[in-house]
Amino acid sequence: MSEVIEKAKKAKVAKEELVHQPTERKNEALSFIAEAIRFKQDEILAENEKDIVRGKEKGFSPALLDRLALTPERLNDIADAVMLLTKLEDPVGETLETIRKDNGLFIENVRVPLGVVGMIYEARPNVTVDAATLCLKTGNAVILRGSSSAINSNKALVRVIREALERSALPEDAVQLIEDTSKETAKQLFTLNDGLDVLIPRGGKNLIDMVVRESTVPVLETGAGNCHIFIDESAQPDMAEQVVINAKTQRPSVCNAIETVLIHKGWAEEHTKALLQKLEEAGVEIRGDEAVCTMLPSAVPARETDWGTEFLAPVVSIKTVAGIDEAIRHIRQYGTRHSEAILTENQENARYFLTSVDAAAVYHNASTRFTDGFEFGYGAEIGISTQKLHARGPMGLKALTSSKYIIKGNGQIRI
């Protein structure tokens, strides 16, 4: 029996036990997990260092190494996020709708767990904890399949989580890690219809596209983040500089960082040069159109492929546009429906942009870096969905539930 099949069977048994666990027991288990992450910090960091060393030997980019790295601060943040989940309302059992029929039937639509959730993801060990704890809070079992680049970190984290579950009333088999990171195990997950209720990919465009293309299991798609900021003609210069610098440089390797800035030509004439200099001082490589390269000779001429690239690095493409309609057309052509922003003092233009742009999150005068489960008050997130069915945007607890109808009667029959 393959590792995938064996662990899927265990997860399936565990999910049947989880549906009977009250919120108090789930929260207790989460508290044990947060405590264990803090207590076993040195052990986790030692295993993470093995992944970092191997990544450097393989020539991983600084952006990839940043996503892979755990630090004491990041582990504390992860533990804090787990504890936050204990304070959030449990969506399972929530009544969505009630109907009382004339014949006496009482119909209730309630939230229920999805069942067994499969997670396939890349070099992000924090996803291991996010996925496991979100699933546990919502009564789901989870099968985790990370990448080979983070295998030591993932094994350490899952070991800590399962040890914490041993102390709790929850089954430790509710959290499974596929340790074989070969392509074969990924393909097995894609077609595990009798073992998985849903599969969630979290990573780069190539991974997500492959899962969507090849999976026969229902997929909750988390999209790549080729995010834009459009600086309208009336944008305040100081605010525009502050928001653009934050959205690009605070953490360039994440999906809600911007990759392209579109600048209204009326704003560009007076203010763009100062913005370009600020970006360059912040260590950002600028790839610009002809107007941008004229203002900043050190800028690299942008190629067509740059407009559609999610750099996940301190690199930004910048283009001047004639107005808001050209900016929206550009976003429609190259955007990934993740997060898009307009900076403007013109309320009509803001309304037009927010209505016209098709994305999971659209912003007016704010950084795209806020598209995040924690920032939205969801605690940790399972991913950011760019699709429209079931869930869209940061997926917190409610996104990991479905619903069912409970009908109560006293002998009614249909005539």
UniProtKB/Swiss-Prot annotation:
HAMAP family per the UniProt record, alphabetical: ProA
Record function comment: Catalyzes the NADPH-dependent reduction of L-glutamate 5-phosphate into L-glutamate 5-semialdehyde and phosphate. The product spontaneously undergoes cyclization to form 1-pyrroline-5-carboxylate.
Entry's Gene Ontology cellular component terms: cytoplasm
Entry's family note: Belongs to the gamma-glutamyl phosphate reductase family.
Main location: cytoplasm
Alphabetic keyword roster: Amino-acid biosynthesis, Cytoplasm, NADP, Oxidoreductase, Proline biosynthesis
Alphabetized InterPro entries for the sequence: Ald_DH/histidinol_DH (IPR016161), Ald_DH_C (IPR016163), Ald_DH_N (IPR016162), Aldehyde_DH_dom (IPR015590), G-glutamylP_reductase_CS (IPR020593), Glu-5-SA_DH (IPR012134), GPR_dom (IPR000965)
Keyword Cell membrane: no
Subcellular location: Cytoplasm
Protein name in UniProt: Gamma-glutamyl phosphate reductase 1
Pfam families attached to this UniProt entry: Aldedh
Keyword Cytoplasm: yes
GO biological process, one term: L-proline biosynthetic process
Superkingdom classification of source: Bacteria
EC numbers on record: 1.2.1.41
Catalytic activity: L-glutamate 5-semialdehyde + phosphate + NADP(+) = L-glutamyl 5-phosphate + NADPH + H(+)
GO molecular function: glutamate-5-semialdehyde dehydrogenase activity; NADP binding
The protein's annotated pathway: Amino-acid biosynthesis; L-proline biosynthesis; L-glutamate 5-semialdehyde from L-glutamate: step 2/2
